[in-house]
UniProtKB/Swiss-Prot annotation:
This is ATP-dependent RNA helicase RhlB. SUPFAM superfamilies: P-loop containing nucleoside triphosphate hydrolases. It comes from the Bacteria. Keywords: ATP-binding, Cytoplasm, Helicase, Hydrolase, Nucleotide-binding, RNA-binding. Residues 243-390 form the Helicase C-terminal domain. It is found in: Cytoplasm. Residues 425-439 have a biased composition (Basic residues).
Amino acid sequence: MSQTHLSNQKFADLPLHPEVKQALAENGFEFCTPIQALSLPVLLQSKDIAGQAQTGTGKTMAFLVATFNHLLSTPIPENRQLNQPRAIIMAPTRELAIQIAKDAILLAKHTHLKVGIVYGGESYDVQRKVLDQGVDILIGTTGRIIDYVRQGIISLNAIQAVVLDEADRMFDLGFIKDIRFLFRRMPNADQRLNMLFSATLSMKVQELAYDHMNDPVKVEIAPEEKTSKNIKEEIFYPSQEDKIRLLLTLIEEDWPEKAIVFSNTKHSCENLWSWLEGDGHRVGLLTGDVPQKKRIRILEQFTQGQLDILVATDVAARGLHISDVSHVYNYDLPDDCEDYVHRIGRTGRAGNKGVSVSFACEEYALNLPAIESYINHSIPVSNYDRDALLDDIPPPVKIHRKHPAGARNLRERSGAGRPQGAHRSGGRPPRHDRTRRQP
């Protein structure tokens, strides 16, 4: 983690429970990020917070540290039953819930607290067996949590800490009724520690906070900067017929270590995957139709470096927390301004540098003024030489519905795509030496 991303506040200097301090030290956490430095002193006084911070700022560890510390420092409720967790962490997507659980387990290893995770798309009975053994901290998506609550498998009567992560996405995905349903089944707000985090603290998010929290303290990290200074943004104005050639040329010349390509529709994503796969790239496809087990497998392949490029829609990519993404390509400009911020926020995390490349084509160019107004700056324009675009592109492959859109054994081709089994750090250089960016 880059030191430029950290504050001068040390975890060791905070009044944390000894077991939490030990867990942080053994996992290499010495200095707080800005959101941690601002939120933890408030939370350690048992005050609620509504925090605004961009993704990749360390907010997950902020609320996990506060949750573990609160449970370790607070007496267990009298007559607490085995099916009553003491803390609940709600996330908008399965992938985000899984990532939070992985981080929570790092802290749980040094405490007696048990962590459980529930989400849709996986075995109901397997997750229930974990709950039947009792958990202290329940992490999950609202739909599956509600299923277990309604069946009496879990009770929220002993909740002492609540986390609502990515609250703005909860609204986008229509989960607010579910959240209110769960809040109504917990002890009163003044009997628990409440934490809400969101990339944006819109009026509807603030209303939710004040309805279900106890006079929360508002914590903001650089709210005037909606995009990170670590991200180099640029935009092209390609014709519709040039778009795919331009994308393949940029990827060929940038040769990103790990890239996500966003498009606005499932059909467009499938088309992009076909072209990239045909060009020999190790590419995965994430749309709303991809089953959960396949999603997890594709994400693992991408995270572990077996895939270099991920093509995704906004809905399919929500909640993804993947480190070391070097490039984001907006093949289509999003219709929602906030989606632009969420998309490019997947690179340039934790103090690292990132690159965001956007296309303003005939169909979506009208979205640009609203996006630039929302982020409070103009995106630098880059031009390209049409004659310098790749002209030896292999045809797209057909999508085989019975096979995962993940890593496959790719055929070797002379002068096209990556050789089979090669990695970005050791693969071939771009097949053409050309300059596609012009002043």
